[in-house]
Design a protein with these regions (language model features):
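Electropositive, beta-rich accessory/interaction domains or terminal extensions
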Residues: 1-131, 171, 175-216
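A short pocket-lining beta-strand/turn micro-motif at the edge of beta-sheets
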Residues: 31, 149-151, 163-165
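Conserved binding-pocket/active-site segment within a compact domain
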Residues: 125-131, 135-138, 144-145, 158
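Short amphipathic alpha-helix initiation/capping segments at coil-to-helix junctions
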Residues: 154-160, 175
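Short, basic/aromatic beta-hairpin or loop at an interaction surface
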Residues: 83-91, 136-149
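Short alpha-helix capping/helix-loop boundary micro-motifs
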Residues: 96-98, 150-156
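Loop/turn positions that initiate beta-strands
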Residues: 107, 158, 162-164
């Protein structure tokens, strides 16, 4: 299990969401990249040095510090879409190999390289920017049907990471709430929502959303 690439975004115009810019255009970088907890959502800060987000209402902050997607899932989408998908094209900071990102448990911890420890926090929910960026009508619906969302992570221990660093799972919590389960519950299968609250590491924002939806 390893990192294939560490990807950092460059600002691009965002005509799809009425914002001045988007950071979804992430490209692999050479050499070490510093990773640190960015603080609360709302500033545009994220976990990787040199990266940022512009939709500060929905992205960034402690619980969405880093976004990871598996190369194996990108390869699957390449076959389905009939086009090459380079590392970073889904807006992911970390492109991994040998990890079941969607099967990771909320609260699972990964050590990357010698120093950095990240914790799985939640699933990526697609937006209009993602659909516009890929230039595929109906992409959000297709992405949701596949339930291969990739994972957001929070920073537990800071440090530097680089492409080809090993990734080790150092903790798996005692529950069955995976990234894919969270995604399915939040999008197409609301009957699964009550199962999510057993995951202590789920962001408070998501827990509150679950409570509202299940008590309405």
């Amino acid at each position: 299990m390893k990192l294939l690439s560490v990807n950092v975004g460059k600002p691009r115009p965002n005509p799809w969401k009425g914002l001045s810019a988007t950071g979804i255009d992430k490209r692999p970088v050479d050499g070490p990249v510093a990773v640190a907890a960015p603080g609360p959502k709302g500033t545009g800060a994220v976990g990787l040095a040199g990266d940022r987000v512009y939709d500060v209402k929905h992205h960034g902050g402690t619980d969405q510090a880093v976004y990871s997607y598996a190369r194996e899932d990108l390869d699957g989408w390449e076959a389905e879409l009939g086009r090459p998908l380079v590392n970073g094209v889904f807006g992911e900071n970390l492109t991994t190999a040998g990890l079941d990102v969607n099967g990771a448990l909320i609260g699972e911890r990964w050590r990357i390289g010698p120093d950095v420890v990240l914790e799985i926090s939640c699933a990526r929910i697609p937006c209009a920017t993602f659909e516009g960026w890929l230039e595929r009508d109906g992409w959000m619906r297709r992405f949701m049907q596949a339930a291969r969302p990739g994972a957001y992570l929070r920073v537990i221990e800071p440090g530097d990471i680089s492409a080809d660093d090993p990734v080790e799972i150092v903790h798996r919590p005692d529950h069955d709430v995976t990234v894919a389960l969270v995604f399915r519950a939040m999008t197409r299968e609301p009957e699964l929502l009550p199962r999510l609250l057993i995951a202590d590491a789920l962001p408070e924002e998501d827990k509150n959303l679950v409570r509202r939806r299940t008590t309405a």
